[in-house]
Regions:
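Phosphodiester-processing cores and adjacent nucleic acid-binding clamps
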Residues: 1-157
Length: 157
């Protein structure tokens, strides 16, 4: 529980949504167990919370079921590596509805299935541009795809 106290405000009235929560399903990025998120959300009356594990949706069902039981609105997301030209970087994606959820499942799966076993999981950025109905796409960080393009002076591409 100590980790959660560092990530969330002390106030019991939530004025923001934490959109980049990583669980134990984000290898080397998160250690928070979904049961702990459930307990924390209940005790702090968190209105909504997003799970955004990297390259997978393995915890999405468990998260949605457990968080919903305590009155917190689950927001399902993931961050996936996208390739644009010779640049690769993460973009956080969030499901706005069931169609968006199915879309990010497909993108997450494709990131593993459509690459050779020697490359890191990624999806061509054009695949996201071609079909993103029901998906909220965030810019990520300076280490994300858009940050990489900006840092290399290629953002206008």
């Amino acid at each position: 529980m100590v980790v959660l106290k560092l990530l969330m405000p002390e106030s019991s009235s939530q004025n923001f949504n934490h959109l980049k929560m990583h669980s134990q399903y984000s290898i080397c990025e998160g250690a928070v167990k979904i049961d702990d998120l459930q307990d924390f959300s209940k005790s702090n009356k968190i209105k909504s919370l997003a799970l955004c594990d990297t390259s997978n949706l393995c915890g999405a069902l468990e998260f949605a079921e457990k968080i919903s039981k305590v009155g917190t609105q689950p927001i399902i997301g993931t961050q996936i590596n996208f390739k644009y030209g010779d640049n690769v970087g993460l973009l956080p994606l969030f499901a706005l509805n069931e169609e968006g959820y199915k879309r990010i499942i497909k993108l997450s799966s494709n990131s593993f299935l459509e690459n050779d076993e020697l490359s890191d999981p990624h999806v061509d950025f054009n695949e996201l541009l071609d079909d993103n109905i029901g998906v909220a796409i965030f810019s990520g960080t300076v280490f994300g795809l858009f940050g990489e393009l900006f840092n290399k002076g290629k953002f206008s591409e």
